[in-house]
Amino acid sequence: MTARWSSPVRYVECDQQGVVFNAHYLTWTDEASYDWWTAHGLPWEDLVARGIDPLVKASSLEWTSAARWGDTVTVDAITEEVGRTSVTVRFTVRVGEQVCCVVRTTYVCASGGVAAPWPDDVRARLTEG
């Protein structure tokens, strides 16, 4: 199941080289992650209300081209792997058809401040599509 988020590149997101500063790619994937969770029928506020707190364990970024001020970026999010206590999501950031960056983020299910297995219904939704 793919979720999509899109936004114009803002001037404030660019550095002196005229390209998007690297940290903003993680901001965009964080925005896209909300849509990804929601697409799986797991809105963030519902997870939190149940005491489920997905925490970022790791993110890796691999750039292939730059996004610049005035571009519109699109982030596609897709489930890459579901573990007992974790899920890895691949975010592809692009301008038009040009891939700018691929980000892989692993979230760990936490409950009460410690890692916990995904509840069965959550795991089932994460593995759909």
Regions found by a protein language model. Name each.
Residues 1-56, 111-129:
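Hot-dog-fold acyl-thioester-processing enzymes
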